[in-house]
Swiss-Prot record:
GO terms for cellular component: cytosol; mitochondrial outer membrane; nucleus. It comes from the Eukaryota. Inclusion body (IB) resident protein that interacts strongly with lipid droplet (LD) proteins. Involved in LD-mediated IB clearing after protein folding stress, probably by enabling access to the IBs of an LD-stored soluble sterol derivative that acts as a chaperone in inclusion clearing. Belongs to the IML2 family. Residues 177-199 are annotated as: Disordered. It comes from Aspergillus clavatus (strain ATCC 1007 / CBS 513.65 / DSM 816 / NCTC 3887 / NRRL 1 / QM 1276 / 107). Keywords: Cytoplasm, Nucleus, Phosphoprotein. It is found in: Cytoplasm; Nucleus. The gene is iml2. Interacts with lipid droplet proteins. Pfam families: Iml2-TPR_39 (PF10300). Its main location: cytoplasm. This is Inclusion body clearance protein iml2.
Length: 721
């Protein structure tokens, strides 16, 4: 362990490299326990250590708990631990630089002395930033952006060392490059000062000043846009030369280290820690920034953040190769991205089958190998069972996905168990297993406090579906489900707004409160029970918002069409009273199902009917103002899926009534046909991206951002002749 006093009082300095190695070795067992869901055991294993690595480990434990559960008390604990880890790492970094010439000190061929502690600082800052942004306090959210900026700069400096090492290794003679531990002179001269300046460039005084400013501004939280408060955080001029940040996110694979863990350059644990850690942290940062909705991405670029999805994914894949805690967390991030985000989005870059270099499609074989490796490495962890279930769902095997989450052991970690239950609830919803879905969401309510209004809302929606199913067959059963549906619908709105993200209400909380208020107003106006004032099946609406259609087989999709048909059936006594808004929702949901069934002409006909109407019909008090922008996105998705390239990978349309949907036989005409489809897709996306603020715009914005990036990539690889 480090003893700061021996350095402060001028005694013989300890060998920092040896102590770093000892601490990293000590952390192996606790790290394994974390990924085997034994967080309490990991806490015990970390309790005795006082090094920066042990402090960071304790911060990681709290961070995992905080981000899996979103509970405020755990977030506060994580923030405190991460602050402590950042402080001790800063002290140790300065000492490592001071003692860099001590006898027997290890000198990395890639990194300057103290880089491992700079990475510890950056990791603590990055995790602290995430906790801050997830915090309900606007002040903490703004502090989080400062920490994010500091971590960004430090990680960029570390990765520039790797780039410099690669460049100088290519120019070195075989004898020079074979010498272990040799450091290019230019790195010795420049690296240390660059790291030190980057890590201290944003002073704590500035953070305190921003926090104070944020506190002053925080009174009218509901009426103030966060973007207005962050526009003053443009820090690029203080820390990087113009263009440096942009340059950091535009490097190609040739500028990145992609060696395997058994490569000779990774013979030292310190180098392994720095390389895997910096690749994971910067990779996740670049990926997340690239995914944010259009309005927020503009704000991030103003204050100096630039995402790069492809580079971020390559870095995460690289980090996942390593057999340590960082490698496992990188693997979890990779699997979560592909099985969650990619399957949530409908317009993504085309996959290139059989190419490991392809990172923006869905590299199924590569993902299966990664998951198998993780399950073998951490056999007791329910996290990897959860990821296997997600992978099954992503590949349209929902029955197996649900089976994996219904049996077997539960996780001793409450937050993991809550995730498992939530995923089980969604899968049951996609499969129209209403009883299981309702029971599972009620279990989520007991385990997690994040979005309890949504849990009650979906539970009520399940009982509404059961009520409609039993209405003609079993009136007593129907009355029972009607009572439960009304109970949970009325319980949901008072819970909305209890949790906040960057001082704002959660999007689905706003949605739930408005929907129930709309139904209550209709019930009063029509003089009917609440359950008869609902309109289009809210479960089908939820399936759409969670993009369950992409996980459903044709059989499940046809069942959704049957559920939607109830609205227009004789069983629905209030359909004749419905206006254009509810009828547009029905058309939109049907169009989404038809698109997933690859019946694009039917989908487009329904969407064109919506878009031909006056947009003002869908605006106003208690109205579903999301209908038109979402219809534009759905049109874009149909255009994307009608391209010859998409058809070659995923199969063709299941209808042949639309002459435009027939792919030209001539290759040159085929490219022009595809270009036309991409152009139309882009036009619809631009309209959706530029739409005024609407309910759930952040959620839909994620899909729009990913789609615009996919279109841009297609245009870059297919320039006009």
């Amino acid at each position: 362990m480090f003893r700061v006093g021996s350095w402060l009082y001028g005694k013989k300095p300890a060998n920092a490299s040896t102590q770093s190695l000892d601490s990293l070795v000590e952390l192996r067992d606790p790290a394994t326990l974390i990924l085997n869901d034994d967080v309490d055991g990991a806490e015990d294993g970390l309790a005795e250590g006082t090094s920066s690595f042990h402090n960071l480990g304790r911060g990681v434990v709290a961070f995992i708990r905080a981000t899996l559960g979103f509970e405020q008390d755990i977030m506060r604990q994580a923030s405190e631990r991460l602050n402590e880890a950042e402080t001790t790492a800063s002290v140790d970094q300065h000492r490592a630089q001071h003692n860099s010439q001590a006898p027997n000190t290890y000198h990395s061929a890639m990194y300057t002395p103290g880089t491992e502690f700079a990475l510890c600082q950056a990791m603590a800052q990055l995790m602290g930033a995430v906790v801050g942004v997830l915090n309900e306090s606007l002040t903490e959210s703004i502090k989080g952006f400062y920490r994010l900026r500091k971590a960004y700069i430090t990680l960029d400096a570390i990765l520039k060392m790797e780039q410099k090492y690669l460049q100088e290794s290519r120019m070195a003679t075989p004898i020079e490059s074979a010498a272990p531990g040799s450091i290019p002179l230019s790195m010795k001269r420049q690296g240390s000062s660059n790291l030190q300046s980057s890590s201290s460039s944003i002073s704590s005084a500035k953070i305190k000043k921003a926090a104070s400013s944020a506190t002053t501004l925080a009174a009218p939280v509901e009426n103030t846009d966060l973007s207005e408060r962050l526009t003053g955080l443009n820090l690029s001029s203080e820390t990087l030369a113009p263009g440096d940040v942009k340059e950091a996110s535009t490097l190609g694979p040739a500028d990145m280290l992609n060696h395997d863990p058994d490569s000779d350059i990774f013979h030292n644990q310190i180098d392994i820690f720095v390389h895997s850690g910096s690749n994971f942290c910067f990779g996740i940062l670049l990926l997340l920034i690239s995914m944010v909705p259009p309005a927020f991405s503009k704000l991030l670029s103003i204050i100096g953040f630039h995402g790069d999805k492809e580079r971020g994914l390559r870095m995460l894949w690289q980090a996942s190769k390593f057999h340590n805690l960082i490698g496992a967390i990188a693997a979890f991030s990779v699997l979560g991205y592909y099985n969650g985000f990619v399957r949530y989005c409908d317009i993504m870059p085309d996959s290139i089958p059989g190419q490991d270099e392809d990172v923006q499609g869905y590299p199924q074989e590569r993902l299966e190998l990664l998951l198998a490796k993780m399950r073998k490495q951490f056999p007791k962890s329910q996290l990897w069972v959860l990821e296997e279930s997600r992978m099954c769902g992503a590949n349209k095997n929902l029955d197996r996905a649900l089976e994996l989450l219904c049996g077997g052991e539960s996780s001793p970690l409450k937050q993991v168990e809550a995730l498992r239950l939530f995923e089980r609830s969604l899968n049951a919803m996609y499969l129209h297993k209403y009883e299981l879905c309702a029971a599972s969401f009620l279990e989520c309510f007991e385990l997690n406090t994040w979005s309890r209004s949504l849990y009650y809302y979906i539970t009520g929606s399940c009982h509404l579906s059961l009520y409609r199913n039993a209405l003609d067959k079993d009136p007593a059963k129907a009355a029972e489900h009607a009572e439960l549906a009304e109970k949970y619908f009325r319980l949901a709105p008072p819970l909305a707004g209890k949790k906040r993200f960057m001082a704002r209400q959660l999007p689905f909380d706003v949605f739930v409160a408005r929907k129930v208020a709309k139904w209550e107003a209709r019930a009063k106006d029509w003089k009917v029970p609440l359950v008869d004032a609902v309109g289009v099946d809210p479960i089908e609406e939820m399936i759409f918002f969670w993009n369950g259609h992409s996980r459903m087989t044709d059989e499940h999709l046809l069942e959704s069409l049957q559920k939607l048909a109830w609205c227009e059936s004789s069983a629905n006594k209030t359909w004749s009273r419905e206006g254009p808004e509810e009828k547009a929702i029905l058309k939109l949901l049907r169009a989404a199902v038809f698109r997933s069934l690859r019946k694009h002409s039917q989908a487009k006909d329904l969407l064109e009917d919506i878009l031909s109407q006056d947009r003002n019909l869908f605006k106003g008090h208690l109205k579903d103002d999301w209908i038109c922008p979402v219809a534009h996105f759905e049109m874009a998705a149909n255009m994307w899926m009608e391209r010859p390239t998409y058809i070659a990978i995923h199969g063709g349309s299941k209808e042949f009534t639309d002459p435009e949907a027939t792919e030209p036989a001539d290759s040159s005409k085929s490219l022009e046909y595809e270009r036309e489809k991409v152009h139309k897709c882009k036009e619809y996306l631009e309209k959706a991206a530029k739409w005024e603020s609407y309910e759930l715009d952040a959620r839909i914005g994620l899909k729009v951002t990913a789609a615009m990036e996919a279109v841009q990539k297609w245009e870059n690889t297919h320039p006009p002749a």
